[in-house]
């Protein structure tokens, strides 16, 4: 298992350090900071408990492709909620840049896991 820190409690309450709490996971979505190395939309305090994955800090592409159309880029969810709004989360768009959307949209995901 791995301990992941995320704003799990704010519900749109803003960037407050106490809102960033731990979960123990085996299978998880990546956070905005773990992918981009910066925070544009999420709780800025998440970065104090996270690190950017070496794969992304090395400059590798953040673009993911659909399983049923491998030349078609896909939108994919991250686990970071928007600090200022409830029910809205960060995702990666088809250009590989950070974006936001309401959580009831069906987007892809590129999970991490721990064995």
Describe the role of every protein-language-model region:
Residues 1-115:
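Collagenous Gly-X-Y triple-helix signature in extracellular proteins
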